[in-house]
């Protein structure tokens, strides 16, 4: 029995991650893979009390849904699962990619500094990933 290949893609709402989702969905179409879209969230270190009405998990889920809706237009035949995880993005992606055939990330996320060739999450995944990692450039 052969299992369906899995492509994990990191989603943070940045233009780079939108391009990564498009690239990953095309690859999923070509290979018959399931697309596993992963977003993560965590409280900034400087926040000690959660402000009323703030729900980072729900905000992250909303961003994930919006990016997928826009980026997957025309890819309705691709099977997609969505995962919102509490924690730093690099380790969250690698945990979700343990059984994956491919991990796809954008070259730069929301926190990238102008002129950087590779963002910290992309670099983390390339250095520590256990499966092939594709970095989609802007």
Give the residues covered by each predicted segment.
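Structural beta-alpha unit
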Residues: 1-3, 16, 30, 72-105
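Small/aliphatic-rich secondary-structure junction motif
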Residues: 2-54
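General small-molecule cofactor/ligand-binding pocket signal
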Residues: 36-38, 81-85, 134
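Short secondary-structure boundary segments
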Residues: 39, 106-108, 137-138
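A short acidic, glycine-rich active-site loop
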Residues: 52-63
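A conserved short alpha-helical segment within the catalytic HATPase_c
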Residues: 64-72
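Glycine-rich, Arg-bearing micro-motifs that act as flexible, cationic patches
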Residues: 102-127
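Short, acidic/small-residue loops that bind anionic groups at enzyme active sites
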Residues: 128-137
């Amino acid at each position: 029995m052969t299992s369906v290949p899995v492509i994990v893609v990191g989603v943070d709402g940045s233009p780079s991650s939108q391009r990564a989702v498009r690239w990953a969905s095309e690859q999923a179409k070509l290979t018959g893979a399931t697309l596993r879209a992963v977003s993560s969230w965590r409280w900034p270190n400087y926040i000690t009390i959660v402000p009323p009405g703030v729900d980072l998990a729900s905000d992250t889920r909303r961003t994930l849904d919006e990016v997928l809706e826009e980026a997957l237009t025309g890819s309705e035949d691709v099977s997609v699962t969505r995962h919102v995880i509490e924690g730093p993005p690099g380790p969250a992606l690698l945990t979700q990619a343990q059984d994956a055939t491919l991990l796809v990330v954008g070259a730069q996320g929301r926190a990238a500094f102008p002129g950087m060739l590779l963002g910290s999450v992309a670099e983390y995944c390339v250095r520590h990933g256990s499966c092939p990692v594709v970095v989609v450039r802007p």
